[in-house]
């Protein structure tokens, strides 16, 4: 009986196994059929797409949803657009008079061909220029809150200034003057950094990055934008980068700090990849003859005044009120403002175009003088651009999120000071460091000199003198700034933000190498220093994500655009004159439908030659073939070299020192 039961059990098990096997076979067959059907369907789809494909460039330059298209090359650059349809019935209201606002007015006149009397610039202060300042204050002295570093591929900036007449030389443009000046007197530094009270740090054009540091930078370079939303630089780099000379160059030149946006850091790499080699000695940079107010702003003001543009000062715009229609349109209907302190409104139609500078890096600037520190409550003085943007943003999500940028002044501030002296002892020490006479009118430091061992991380620079047209011949104006304003100094035992101009001078003279016993008298009697604390100077570097900055022309807007450093435009980088002018060009071209391309951001990031060059330079002359690459990449070196041998690729790799 037992054997019979066992045979039956085994038979049942075999039947089960056969059943499972049969089911598996059926399933496998079905899967194979489904897979085959999918492949056949995919083949048909590809065949259909290919059969419908036609090579053409029609539509290549059609406007995008914002009413613009991007272009490159001389054909578009030298062409003048036709007069936009209906422009004679339109008016423009421009809020602010900084570089972006004035550029918008210039583009309205030149390319939009709008009559000057129909363009209204509304400025809260009694002086134009915004952050591009440069002034002599009789009660304080010369004041420059900052300087402007420029390069040859600021495509929109130079497109504008080729048309702005010089106010010094009849018959030439601002660009002509600038071009000739920088050809005759090219910029470069002979001492990038000092240590031990004025000794050359001998950075010697090296980045001093480890292999791991280079790989961290390359990884960031290739990371998608969306993977960097709300991330800081500390999230993507470690001490392999932060302890390098590269990082000293980077944070002192661009004012990046460890807690700033990793996304913006990546964009900077990509935007200026063609200038990596010029980073250590500033040979990539170009500067104006005078301060940016006299060199850039005043010629624009003159151009606009001649065209009949209306400037209305002491007019603080507090809000723009929108109507939203059922079909998704957003129409600016009212400008709310205060004129000389009295509240008033400006009624708008769809034919009234409104351009608003949202946010400002110099809003709430606190001024000191030689005997007073720049102390005050920045929160109280946030009533201008920031509150205007907040009021606008409260009406629609597409208008951005200003609080992402202006809510933490401990992370967005730094302080600068303008130092003026004619003392020979100080000037001799300057000349010893920068190896140039500051009084020749030519390049002096060629960019900032950073004091590597300064607790404040103090840097200073002297541009061509005089920086002001009215400056005395024996006077030298020095610009000093520090990134770490809340730590005590090396000579002055207090934070920079608590220091008077005299005390800041003492700290600077100490790092300059002036004998310690001479510092007090020189700082008190031989120098005039004006400090300026800027609570939001690096607000645009704060970590962000898509939507935090509004598009230049937000979706649905028919008569409204944003301008400046807190408006979103693809691929370009903030804290540049180019960014302000680019947003202005896009705003005017988009709202007026100007039939001409906006020059695209220079495409060096897509140029294999620049990528090869920059890789070798970042590694201080080494080839990537000389280092251990991760994993299987290392094993691919020889096969790849064999594959390209005798080809134009091998020639290219040799020309750019990949094959050495």
Please provide the spans of the model-predicted regions.
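Short, Lys/Arg-enriched N-terminal segments with co-localized hydrophobic residues
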Residues: 1-9
